[in-house]
Amino acid sequence: MEQTYQYAWIIPFLPLPVPMLIGLGLLLFPTATKSLRRMWAFQSVLLLSIVMIFSMNLSIQQINSSSVYQYVWSWIINNDFSLEFGYLIDPLTSIMSILITTVGIMVLIYSDNYMSHDHGYLRFFAYMSFFSTSMLGLVTSSNLIQIYIFWELVGICSYLLIGFWFTRPVAAKACQKAFVTNRVGDFGLLLGILGFYWITGSFEFRNLFQIFNNLISNNEVNLLFVTLCAVLLFAGAIAKSAQFPLHVWLPDAMEGPTPISALIHAATMVAAGIFLVARLLPLFIVIPHIMNFISLIGIITVFLGATLALAQKDIKRGLAYSTMSQLGYMMLALGMGSYRSALFHLITHAYSKALLFLGSGSVIHSMETLVGYCPKKSQNMVLMGGLTKHVPITKTSFLLGTLSLCGIPPLACFWSKDEILNDSWLYSPIFAIIAWSTAGLTAFYMCRIYLLTFEGHLNVQFQNYSGKKNTPFYSISLWGKEGSKISNKNFRLVTLLKMKKNGRASFFSNKVYKIDENLRNIIQPFLSIPHFGTTKTYSYPYESDNTMLFPILILVLFTLFVGFLGIPFNQDGVDLDILSKWLTPSINLLHKNSNNSIDWYEFCKDAVFSVTISSFGIFIAFFLYKPVYSSFQNLDLINSFVKIDPKRIFSDKIKNGIYDWSYNRGYIDAFYGTFLTVGIRKLAEFAHFFDRRIIDGIPNGVGLMSFFVAEVIKSVGGGRISSYLFFYFSYVSIFLVIYYFLNF
């Protein structure tokens, strides 16, 4: 066992040869390197698989022995300062390593087909392998300096991958936004690291925790300064994990390729903030009020992310806000001191969200056959619908991921989210009410995404992409399916079916119109597949290739079974709670005397309540988004109910308000753009003016004045000796007069 730990330092460096060799090959042998590009993808998967096997071996030893191994090398040693580098292997490291490698392997296999037609194929795999190296280095770091170094490398990789298609202005702006927003948090992280080093004199986690606990117990530190340093450390996690108020970069990060979105949202960048707080939790729990602040940020993010996801039309942005909300649950759990629940939800959410993003990538891939390569169209749920019969495997997989995120048993996220919800009652009833309500919102918006994408009819077939605006065959209501003015900000939730040119029918009309099958052929195919004797074209979406379906199906298995790792049933000598053994010892401020086991009655009571709330959200989504032309045959009762309802106008205003809030991202981006961006630009303009007119103006003015004085003197003198003598005696006379008055 000791020998296995001794070689653990190699974990972050195994994927590193791929980007180095790709860069060297493109520099020296570009033609040969590009012709063998599939070989580089195979090497990426192979090396990451070796890391996964190594991490699994470490995890098995962690479960059996609960040991912690740390090895350090001294780099700088003197009387006043010492700096060491090393690696730390503990349960948190092993969990994160398995998470990064398993999701990373699935994404790499998926990307081989997804990016096969892209000219940046090799660049993509180089970035991905470097991303894995950076994240693995982060989770194995033994001190704050290493954390910060790999933290910045993760940020650089995310910048490169979000802006992978940098020729698109939207993608270029998105990566800049992510980079700048994270710089705010990273600067706070750096200041926090320096602050705690100034307090304790150490960067190493073990020494840092021990020294700081002694200082706190002896009351030898300034609590206000310590709290400030802790908040600065937490600012790094706020930015990286897209917590309020530094969450604004996350939806724009969807401009990168879909496999990148899966990796960022499941196991790498956004998980880094959760990892940092979990790693520093022994430090935070002894600082007054910082845990309350962490839980407050978490609960705000939980609710804000859920409300912003309600009216998104872009399938990836809807999933992005879902990630933001779920990360809020993890941060809430850490703030409550429920270490196990937070990591449990990190694991289950990672696999479920990776499944959803890869499934959305499969949908986008199939939609591109109809609308061409245009993310605004291929990712727009307004143009989807009716994909069940075209992509049945993707549909089933996406449904399982959706139900998991909704908290439906026995899928993965049910077990972890339920644990956080139950712990929230012990911490704060107000936080608990918000968390449980958001669980219903989660079920609503996830079911909405599923219904708009897969149910009903294929809406893109009723659009005209010849460059002319054409009235669609029907419009789709309630924050997803709309008419021809898709980007109209004044769009309201008027639920109409537009028939022909002038005819209109109510959403609640009992007439069901049959769609002419001839209309399905009005779209010309945009994608043709060469390399065959005859050109094959598609007029319908089609299921993805096996290379893309294989990772999706593997993630389905994870979504089905990974939740059983943390089932807290330890009764009659049967120990099912593998996760608790894995995380021994762990921090739990809410159950200090508990052995992480509960009885069946208590569990079933809480589970029924949470499933009821989720089911209610699913029911509302089905009621609002289930296609009327395929479900409702007789709606006279609903029509009569709507006609006699005196509060319909008021309810429409509420719906429109919710829509505007979600569509405009809670007006937070607008606030930043209006006050921060404009203010900074005005400050920059003032600094430019001050620099040019004042700083440069003073020496330039002195030089210019000297020039004019010299010219005046030169013109007066004229080169005549009599003039020089006149000025000489004049100055001498003035000097003598001044001397006389000063001395007498």
UniProtKB/Swiss-Prot annotation:
GO CC aspect terms: chloroplast thylakoid membrane
Gene Ontology BP terms: ATP synthesis coupled electron transport; electron transport coupled proton transport
Listed transmembrane segments: 9-29, 40-60, 89-109, 125-145, 147-167, 185-205, 219-239, 258-278, 290-312, 327-347, 354-374, 396-416, 425-445, 549-569, 608-628, 724-744
Chief location category: plastid
Keyword NAD in record: yes
Catalyzed reactions per annotation: a plastoquinone + NADH + (n+1) H(+)(in) = a plastoquinol + NAD(+) + n H(+)(out); a plastoquinone + NADPH + (n+1) H(+)(in) = a plastoquinol + NADP(+) + n H(+)(out)
Pfam family, one: Proton_antipo_C
GO MF annotation list: NADH dehydrogenase (ubiquinone) activity; quinone binding
Top class in the EC scheme: translocase
Assigned keywords, A-Z: Chloroplast, Membrane, NAD, NADP, Plastid, Plastoquinone, Quinone, Thylakoid, Translocase, Transmembrane, Transmembrane helix, Transport
Keyword Transport: yes
E.C. number(s) listed in UniProt: 7.1.1.-
Subcellular location: Plastid, Chloroplast thylakoid membrane
Membrane-topology descriptor: Multi-pass membrane protein
Source organism, top-level taxon: Eukaryota
Family that this chain belongs to: Belongs to the complex I subunit 5 family.
Function: NDH shuttles electrons from NAD(P)H:plastoquinone, via FMN and iron-sulfur (Fe-S) centers, to quinones in the photosynthetic chain and possibly in a chloroplast respiratory chain. The immediate electron acceptor for the enzyme in this species is believed to be plastoquinone. Couples the redox reaction to proton translocation, and thus conserves the redox energy in a proton gradient.
The protein's assembly and partners: NDH is composed of at least 16 different subunits, 5 of which are encoded in the nucleus.
Protein name, per record: NAD(P)H-quinone oxidoreductase subunit 5, chloroplastic
Organism: Adenocaulon himalaicum
